[in-house]
Curated annotation (Swiss-Prot):
Family classification: In the central section; belongs to the AAA ATPase family. In the C-terminal section; belongs to the peptidase M41 family.
Record-given protein name: ATP-dependent zinc metalloprotease FtsH
Binding site for Zn(2+): 522, 526, 598
Gene Ontology CC, one term: plasma membrane
Organism: Syntrophus aciditrophicus (strain SB)
Membrane-topology annotation of the record: Multi-pass membrane protein
CDD domains assigned to the protein according to its UniProt record, in alphabetical order: RecA-like_FtsH (cd19501)
């Protein structure tokens, strides 16, 4: 019935070198151009190159940044060239040939009629061998019922040995002297006659369209298809766009600028990035003393903490182009695409320098080399190698700063994290109470709030929430207010939205009175321990209304953020988790499946106390388990062997069992002492289904739990080690 859930390459593309003047090379230079002409052309090229250098130098003096163009012969300058005209024509001719073959295959040639004499035609009519005719002017075209053998007169004169051809479809011309009896003669011999006026002859334009229309349609379709694929990139990019970067460019002039005013609650991370903005705005301030800007800044934090928003704010404050791309978008099925896209991304950034490149989820391509591929370099490793090359100090990249975000920094390759690539690491933590209130103010700028809606109280009620969580909370509250046809968002809307997010939505479930009573005692056990244990988190709400996967909920939250926990607090938390099972055993003398999640979480907490935090007298101060936080330093690899012996494993199990057993007995002892209050609370829950903090205190007659250091500790508490709302979520009840 419940659980105490903590809310908490192929090689690089070929480079084709062409002379500056394609027709002047080798023999052509000997025979087609004089020495004077060659010298003039060389002088022109030198002058043109000098002009280009002067233009680049002037650009550097104005902006303080090196030119984005690369020197002749450098790898960057040969990253991507336009398709030569000859190649474009080659593809065009190839498409025409394919089109012609397809038309020949799809539209087979019709049988061509054979010109026969008029007398032969009349003779076959007399024999009844003409099936049908079609007349247009003086020309008659028709079909014989049975094919005949016919050899034209010119063929007879040329070579009489040629065999006669079988004729089925024929054409003939009516003599200028009209045969007046032809029509009756045809009808009497059962010939089907068709005719068309001469003035309905097809126009020349119609003939052209009829002849070339299908081919033109095929060509237009291929052109559209190739352009579409080139725009989409990836496999769809085909020949023209396979190596193009998929980065999205955000220019601050094209939309609403994101600034640090839109970022709240993460002041420490924001302060780390202010210097980056200052460098982009005023480079000489730092370069005059020999300083250089960090080439890369790695943003580390849990999902939803605002890493992407911080990167956009840096670009907005500096007023430079912002190129954003997910690391997963670099790699495709075709080998070498990832490295090509990395080169293209940095090339675009150089062309628009100063600029910011933002790579989200860097761990998708930045994992340590050698962990994924077996027996050779993988596509991911080639992409990583190209990123390392682009960020290396050997290439001039002044004015380009790379920002990257990840929630798994420990899996990144060490070469990626060394100074000279990602020089700085900025940790974006979850906001504290003050930070959450500031974030709520940002997200409620356009939301009309009622007078009873206190953002401070809401911030206190949402410990452990990230910026994305708070934004979702405000949106859910606004939607609830709209469904209720209100003109503003009230405190009730925020509370209901919070319960929906943390506890899950209410679900209709028809329960018997016996099931309701058992659930009420289960939740009552959690609530009573939350009231009598010293230092326990406040019990804000208890309900037996099914929510999400839970049949009932006990909702607790701390009064302030907590960052350090004593052993007594953790032991008290385990006692609180086992309060539901203890209440069932005391009242009914039986067990149900409802405490499954409670037991799972209590066991996990006890295991961490023994293996990670050194809270076992038997095992002492030894860490026997890797860190479990996947965001700020998880295990270095997967499937690694445990770092202890079988005997130590048995000792760990014994200590965990001891802690759980002692906590279970303590929970039952306390509930027996407060059995009267437990019965009253369960009865009220069956009747009202949901009780808030004041109603619980009034019904039980108990005061809120005293502070952890106030007097003797009968049981520390049932609070939450992560300072998030402690929620008791019962599982599915067993058979009654």
């Amino acid at each position: 019935m419940d659980s105490n859930v903590d809310s908490q390459r192929v090689p690089d593309g070929q480079i084709f070198f062409r002379p500056v003047h394609p027709g002047i090379s080798g023999k052509d230079m000997e025979s087609g151009t004089s020495d004077g002409q060659q010298r003039k052309m060389m002088e022109f090229e030198i002058s043109e190159e000098a002009d280009m250098r002067l233009t680049r130098q002037q650009t550097q003096n104005r902006t303080g940044f090196a030119s984005a163009d690369t020197k002749q012969g450098s790898p960057e300058g040969a990253d991507r060239k336009k398709m030569p005209p000859g190649k474009a024509w080659l593809w065009f001719v190839l498409i025409l040939i394919v089109n012609f073959l397809m038309v020949r295959l799809l539209i087979p040639d019709a049988e061509q009629p054979v010109m026969v004499p008029y007398t032969l035609f009349k003779g076959e009519v007399g024999k009844g061998n003409v099936k049908e005719i079609f007349s247009r002017g003086d020309t008659i075209t028709g079909r014989f019922k049975e094919e005949i053998a016919y050899q034209a007169a010119e063929e007879k004169a040329g070579d009489s040995r040629k065999a006669s051809k079988a004729v089925t479809t024929f054409t003939t011309t009516v003599p200028s002297f009209v045969d007046p009896g032809l029509e009756a003669f045809l009808i009497s011999n059962g010939v089907e006659i068709s005719a068309k006026p001469i003035h309905e002859e097809r126009s020349p334009w119609a003939t052209i369209v009829y002849s070339f229309g299908p081919g033109l349609l095929f060509i237009a379709f291929y052109i559209w298809l190739f352009r579409r694929m080139a725009q989409q990139g990836g496999l769809g990019g085909g020949i023209m766009g396979i190596g193009k970067s998929k980065a999205r460019r955000y220019d601050q002039e094209e939309g609403r600028k994101v600034t640090f005013d839109d970022v709240a609650g993460i002041d420490e991370a924001e302060n780390e990035l202010v210097e980056i903005v200052d460098f982009l705005k005023d480079p000489p301030k730092y370069t005059r003393l020999g300083g250089t800007a960090p080439k890369g800044v790695l943003l580390v934090g849990a999902p939803g903490t605002g890493k992407t928003l911080l990167a956009k704010a840096v670009a907005g404050e500096a007023g430079v182009p912002f190129f954003s791309m997910s690391a997963a978008e670099f790699v495709e099925m075709i080998v070498g695409v990832g490295a090509a896209r990395v080169r293209d991304l940095f090339k675009q950034a150089r062309e628009h320098a100063p600029a910011i490149i933002f790579i989200d989820e860097l761990d998708a391509i930045g994992r340590a080399r050698g962990q994924v591929a077996i027996g050779g370099a993988s596509e991911q490793e080639q992409t990583l190698n190209q990123i390392l090359t682009e960020m290396d100090g050997f290439s001039s990249r002044e004015g380009i700063i790379v920002l990257a975000a990840t929630n798994q920094p420990d899996v990144l390759d060490k070469a990626l994290l060394r100074p000279g690539r990602f020089d700085r690491r900025v940790v974006v933590n979850l906001p504290d109470k003050v930070g959450r209130e500031a974030i709520l103010k940002v997200h409620t700028r356009s939301v009309p709030l009622a007078k009873d809606a206190s953002l401070g109280e809401l911030a206190a009620a949402t410990p452990g929430f990230s910026g994305a969580d708070l934004r979702n909370l405000v949106n859910e509250a606004a939607l609830m207010a709209a469904r209720r046809d209100q003109d503003d968002v009230r405190a009730r809307d925020f509370l209901d939205a919070l319960e929906k997010i943390v506890l899950g939505p209410e679900r209709p479930l028809l329960l018997s009175h016996a099931d309701k009573e058992r659930i009420a005692y289960h939740e009552g056990g959690h609530a009573i321990l939350g009231l009598v244990a010293h230092g326990a988190d406040r019990v804000h709400r208890v309900t037996i209304v099914p929510r999400g996967q839970a049949l009932g909920v006990t909702y607790q939250r701390p009064d302030s953020d907590r960052y350090n926990y004593t052993e007594a607090y953790l032991r008290a938390k385990i006692v609180g988790m086992l309060g539901g099972r203890a209440a069932e055993e005391i009242v009914y003398g039986t067990r149900t499946t409802g405490a499954e999640s409670d037991i799972e979480q209590a066991t996990g907490l006890a295991h961490r106390m023994v293996t990670r935090w050194g809270m076992s007298e038997r095992l002492g101060l030894i860490q026997l388990a890797p860190r479990e936080n996947p965001y700020l330093g998880g295990p270095a690899g997967y499937g690694s062997a445990r770092p202890f012996s079988d005997g130590t494993a048995e000792a760990i199990d014994a200590e965990v069992i001891r802690i759980i057993a002692e906590s279970h007995e303590e929970a039952k002892r306390l509930l027996r002492a407060y059995r009267k209050q437990l019965d009253v609370l369960a009865e009220a829950l069956v009747a009202q289904e949901t009780l808030d903090e004041q109603e619980i205190l009034r019904i039980t007659g108990l005061p809120p739990a005293p502070a952890l250091d106030a007097g003797k500790l009968p049981v520390p508490d049932g609070g939450d080690k992560n300072a998030e709302p402690s929620v008791s979520l019962p599982g599915v009840a067993g058979p009654s």
